[in-house]
Amino acid sequence: MASRKTISFVTGNKNKLKEVQQFLHGSSSINITSVPLDLPEYQGEPDDVSKQKCAEASKQLSGPVLIEDTCLCFNAMGGLPGPYVKWFLEKLGPEGIYKMLDGWEDKSGYALCTFAYSNGLQGDDVLLFRGKCEGTIVPPRGPRTFGWDPCFQPNGFNETYAEMSSELKNSISHRGKALEALSEYFKEKNCD
């Protein structure tokens, strides 16, 4: 029997780790561990930021790594706050995120998740796995346990991410879609 491949997921967020482990739980040969690593905050487009963070993490840890970068993008603001949503959320909270759109009629937006994976071998490309979910920015509803989930309502649903069961959220969310793409990659590489 082959040994399990350990991949370091660079996060200090236990909720994110749990979500990733739940989604990839069927993989018998992959072990996802959490490594809280302080990486530089790169500026730029989501794909570029993800690649830079993953390459730096792989260099520091000398092995296979997985990083996740999430954006919340408002259509009225040309995609902002985008990859900078973390900083807005820390300063404003979910209520402030919603109030950012006070001056606009258009409250539509999308959540974008990018997982970047490096096998840890120098010279190999960083691979990206993306998921996107269209929705509306609404007044916060539901538990405040997971970032901006209380103010994002996916199209076709009457609940915010925060009000949904984890099973439903994982099946439709930007992160769930990105994890599905990642899972398919590991299946193709016979890592499960």
UniProtKB/Swiss-Prot annotation:
Principal location: cytoplasm
Catalytic activity field: ITP + H2O = IMP + diphosphate + H(+); dITP + H2O = dIMP + diphosphate + H(+); XTP + H2O = XMP + diphosphate + H(+)
GO MF annotation, one: nucleoside triphosphate diphosphatase activity
Entry keyword Nucleotidyltransferase: no
GO cellular component terms, A-Z: cytoplasm
Location(s), subcellular: Cytoplasm
Co-factor(s): Mg(2+); Mn(2+)
Alphabetized InterPro entries for the sequence: ITPase (IPR027502), ITPase-like_fam (IPR029001), RdgB/HAM1 (IPR002637)
SUPFAM superfamilies: ITPase-like
Entry-linked CDD domains: HAM1
Annotated cofactor note: Binds 1 divalent metal cation per subunit; can use either Mg(2+) or Mn(2+).
GO annotation terms (biological process): deoxyribonucleoside triphosphate catabolic process; nucleoside triphosphate catabolic process; nucleotide metabolic process
Residues that, per the record, bind ITP: 11-16, 53, 69-70, 86, 146-149, 169, 174-175
Main enzyme class: hydrolase
TM regions (residue ranges): none
Oligomer and partners: Homodimer.
Similarity field: Belongs to the HAM1 NTPase family.
Protein name: Inosine triphosphate pyrophosphatase
